[in-house]
């Protein structure tokens, strides 16, 4: 933290209209900071009935800001979001991958476009309602730690943040558990105290994912096959399926199958537009032993090349897995201590040293004993 007192320290809070960011603003105000609330409009989400959830969310921001006595603004990042997040989202699906727009949104919008805007407002820091913690060393190095609420920890989505971004960021909810955040909101009588949490990708909201994606990318139906070459039917388009997926295949008890085990997506081949399926949660083709990833970013300064044994997550809320990472610039090879199920190209692999989130990269390809897994 700077040598300024809280009263001299301006913190611009990203307020979404949800309970987490509302309590973030409240706590900072109670601690004596000079707080400004900012609502980011990242997507035109007007539905076919002319209803825009962003309008309702902004009303909630205004109500909470008025209640706690802080000024508030709205800023439009629709163009930045389209260019930096949505175009990436579509490009990944075109490439047969499964993107993670939340990771990209934090990297490009909430901690870049928003951070820049906050600095124009004279901010010393930005703050968000994410469940993560920061610890600063005497030399000024900032470490990003998991949130105290293990069920809500969001460091996975914040893994692409840089040291420069973290030095200007506060996470006031990091030491709290979610039920306590709700209690604080209710005790303060905040307008958002009972508002349910938003889930899913912000620009899709409650819409049907298949229908939404089909509006932007033409679906290309193709063959659904087993790895032995047995045809199992047709798929609706590779972009609608992810590695390890069970539902939506439409192949129940048929084709003289030998067991009653459910069917899963075990592979994709973009060149032939084939979806590969197999029976059993633990199908051998779902397991790999290493991966290559790119766009590697660390939360603090690291050497250009090094090897390290640490733990990793390959998706949100997954148990940590022991790994050895081999870093070369912005690329990394990750060897798993034991085989891992359903590694998904396009998703983030995030590295941890105990409680500290070291950073992350985007998965390009998975291997099983040096053999490329046909996952895209």
Swiss-Prot record:
Active site: 105 (nucleophile), 202 (cysteine persulfide intermediate)
A Pfam family hit: tRNA_Me_trans_M
Site residues, Interaction with tRNA: 130, 347
Amino acids binding ATP: 14-21, 40, 129
Keywords, sorted A to Z: ATP-binding, Cytoplasm, Disulfide bond, Nucleotide-binding, RNA-binding, Transferase, tRNA processing, tRNA-binding
Reactions performed catalytically: S-sulfanyl-L-cysteinyl-[protein] + uridine(34) in tRNA + AH2 + ATP = 2-thiouridine(34) in tRNA + L-cysteinyl-[protein] + A + AMP + diphosphate + H(+)
Region (Interaction with tRNA) location: 152-154, 315-316
UniProt record, GO biological process: tRNA wobble position uridine thiolation
GO molecular function: ATP binding; tRNA binding; tRNA-uridine 2-sulfurtransferase activity
The protein's Enzyme Commission number: 2.8.1.13
CC annotations in GO: cytoplasm
Location in the cell: Cytoplasm
Disulfides per UniProt: 105-202
Highest rank taxon of the organism: Bacteria
Region annotated Interaction with target base in tRNA, chain positions: 100-102
Gene3D superfamilies, alphabetized: Adenine nucleotide alpha hydrolases-like domains, HUPs, Translation factors
Keyword Ubl conjugation: no
Function description: Catalyzes the 2-thiolation of uridine at the wobble position (U34) of tRNA, leading to the formation of s(2)U34.
Family, per entry: Belongs to the MnmA/TRMU family.
NCBIfam families found in the cross-reference section: PRK00143.1, trmU
Protein name: tRNA-specific 2-thiouridylase MnmA
Origin species: Lactococcus lactis subsp. cremoris (strain MG1363)
